[in-house]
UniProtKB/Swiss-Prot annotation:
Pfam families reported for this sequence: MAJIN (PF15077)
Domain of life: Eukaryota
Keywords: Chromosome, DNA-binding, Meiosis, Membrane, Nucleus, Telomere, Transmembrane, Transmembrane helix
UniProt-recorded name of the protein: Membrane-anchored junction protein
Chain segments annotated as transmembrane: 152-170
Organism: Homo sapiens (Human)
Assembly, per entry: Component of the MAJIN-TERB1-TERB2 complex, composed of MAJIN, TERB1 and TERB2.
Gene: MAJIN
Length: 176
């Protein structure tokens, strides 16, 4: 499909996010750009493939910024295209941000360690004082580790699956 000239009825500013760069486009009404005629200018005849706009696209783009692998194996060309290069030196990666889930996990591990040490301290004290009860010693409670995840999907569908586990809807029922 060839590109055809078009105009907008109202002036508009658009932003294109390409990697670390942000390009600003001012689209104005009329056939000229800043008073210059278009016919004598070099025109870019490339088409840009833009994914469908959704609310989650912004989050996916932020996530892709930190990933090195392509987001979707079925459409690998989408995120590999580089529009421009940055004039800055190599970017320094930030250390991973501590998420709420990681904080909760660390807190839970700390509580488990504290609970285990408290139980062993009480058992030692009881045995020293001769208060131990007949019967075997029960080890502290251990939380079961979560079941191994099924083959983890990467890219956009992996992102959606992390938000909402679709596998529960598409499970094969044993009542067939």
């Amino acid at each position: 499909m060839s590109l055809k000239p078009f105009t907008y009825p109202f002036p508009e500013t658009r932003f294109l996010h390409a990697g670390p760069n942000v390009y600003k486009f001012k689209i104005r009404y009329g056939k000229s750009i800043r008073g210059e005629e278009i016919e004598n200018k070099e025109v870019i005849t490339q088409e840009l493939e833009v994914p469908v706009e959704k609310k989650a696209v912004g989050a996916v783009m932020r996530k892709r910024k930190h990933m090195d692998e392509p987001s979707s194996p079925s459409r690998p060309g989408l995120d590999r295209a580089k529009i421009g290069t940055s004039s800055q030196g190599p970017s320094k990666k930030k250390p991973p941000v501590e998420t709420r889930r990681n904080r909760e996990r660390k807190t839970q591990q700390g509580l488990q360690e504290t609970l285990a040490s408290d139980i062993t301290d009480v058992q030692k004290q009881d045995s020293e004082w001769g208060h131990s009860l007949p019967g075997r010693i029960v080890p502290p409670l251990q939380h079961n580790s979560p079941p191994p995840k099924e083959r983890a999907a990467t890219g956009f569908f992996g992102f959606l699956s992390s938000l909402f586990p679709f596998r529960y809807f598409f499970r094969k029922s044993s009542h067939s």
